[in-house]
């Protein structure tokens, strides 16, 4: 009775909470071996709480990331949606990439990573550029709820997904990614089906924004015609405001 309300904390959880540290109470490798979804969950907690994952836990995540293939995609998708709803989704995706889990279920996104140099000319790393775009978008729509902007966030994450398939180097000109928005838009249905995301109007919305995302850039050109502006307004329809973010 004299110990009623006394917290029993054999693993030092209170201290970890105070210090903003995530760790597994038992052996990390065994923990993630028992249920590999905990790898994605750890990235999600780090993303939502702004906590750091301790090194032994990260090592366990790396060692067992290959076991992601035993999971149903529905379970992974549920965690992905929570990462996408966070204030800084890039944290979760960086962790999943660094531990090798992202490669297991989202290879199209990982394909954006890397910098190639030809004749001294290099292109930017489109993976980390994409994560920055997502974070910037989330910040710019902070007055709107995460549920309201969820599919806009997915569109930002997938906006350059077609670049690896359209990358070209032209001597004397440099790197180009012509048509990457169309290639990316065509990839959306297959990715949504595999990732167990809804293949309804929400997918159509993402596909539309990916397809049109490069068009507003052309409007910066002083020579752009009024008809080009009208075409964009017509093609974008109700999504014009989201497209311009």
Over which residues does each language-model region extend?
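Alpha-helical scaffolding flanking metal-ion-dependent phosphate/phosphodiester catalytic sites
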Residues: 154-165, 224-245
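Active-site-proximal binding-pocket segments
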Residues: 220-222
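Glycine- and charge-enriched loop/helix tracts that form the active or gating conduit
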Residues: 1-157, 161-203, 207, 211, ...
């Amino acid at each position: 009775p004299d110990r009623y309300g006394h917290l029993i904390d054999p693993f030092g959880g209170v201290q970890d909470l105070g210090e903003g540290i995530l760790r597994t109470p038992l052996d990390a490798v065994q923990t993630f071996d028992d249920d590999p979804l905990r790898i994605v969950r750890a990235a999600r907690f780090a993303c939502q709480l702004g906590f750091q994952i301790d090194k032994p836990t990260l090592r366990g995540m790396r060692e067992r990331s290959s076991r992601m293939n035993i999971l149903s995609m529905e379970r992974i998708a549920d965690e992905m949606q929570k990462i996408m709803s966070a204030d800084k989704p890039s944290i979760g995706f960086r962790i999943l990439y660094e531990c090798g889990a992202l490669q297991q279920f989202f290879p199209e996104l990982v394909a954006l990573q890397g910098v190639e140099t030809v004749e001294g000319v290099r292109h930017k790393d489109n993976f980390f550029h994409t994560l920055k775009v997502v974070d910037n978008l989330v910040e710019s729509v902070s007055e709107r709820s995460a549920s309201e902007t969820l599919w806009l966030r997915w569109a930002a994450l997938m906006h350059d997904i077609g670049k690896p398939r359209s990358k070209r180097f032209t001597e004397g000109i440099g790197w180009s990614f012509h048509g990457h928005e169309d290639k990316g838009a065509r990839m959306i249905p297959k990715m949504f089906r595999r990732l167990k995301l809804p293949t309804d109007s929400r997918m159509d919305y993402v596909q539309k924004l990916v397809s049109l995302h490069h068009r507003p850039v052309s409007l910066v050109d002083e020579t752009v015609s009024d008809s080009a502006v009208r075409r964009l307004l017509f093609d974008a329809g109700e999504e014009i405001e989201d497209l311009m973010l």
